[in-house]
């Protein structure tokens, strides 16, 4: 299991979700994608994305610096 990182800071939704989707082919089953984003609607977008693709959203929360961090398992 590997952890890949994606910094989507500065992008407005749905751009962070599009960046997440573009990484799908790079990840293997069990890998985790850690995403940092500062879009105010990121949490709702990423929850819907994970639900649609049936990917576990392991964690989502405030990073302490005004940004959100989430972990998506593939």
Regions found by a protein language model. Name each.
Residues 7, 36, 60-61:
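Solvent-exposed beta-strand sheet faces enriched in polar/charged residues
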Residues 47-74:
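C-terminal structural segments of small proteins and small subunits
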Residues 1-5, 32-34, 67-69:
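Intrinsic-disorder/low-complexity, polar/charged segments enriched in Ser/Thr/Lys/Arg/Asp/Glu/Gln
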Residues 19-55:
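Amphipathic, hydrophobic secondary-structure cores in small proteins
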Residues 1-29:
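An N-terminal amphipathic alpha-helical segment
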């Amino acid at each position: 299991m590997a952890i890949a990182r994606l910094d989507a800071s500065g992008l407005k939704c749905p751009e962070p979700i599009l960046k997440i989707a573009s990484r799908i082919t790079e990840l293997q089953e069990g890998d985790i994608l850690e995403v940092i984003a500062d879009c105010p609607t990121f949490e709702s977008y990423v929850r819907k994305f994970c639900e649609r693709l049936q990917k576990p959203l392991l964690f989502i929360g405030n990073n302490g610096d005004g940004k959100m961090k989430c972990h998506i398992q593939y």
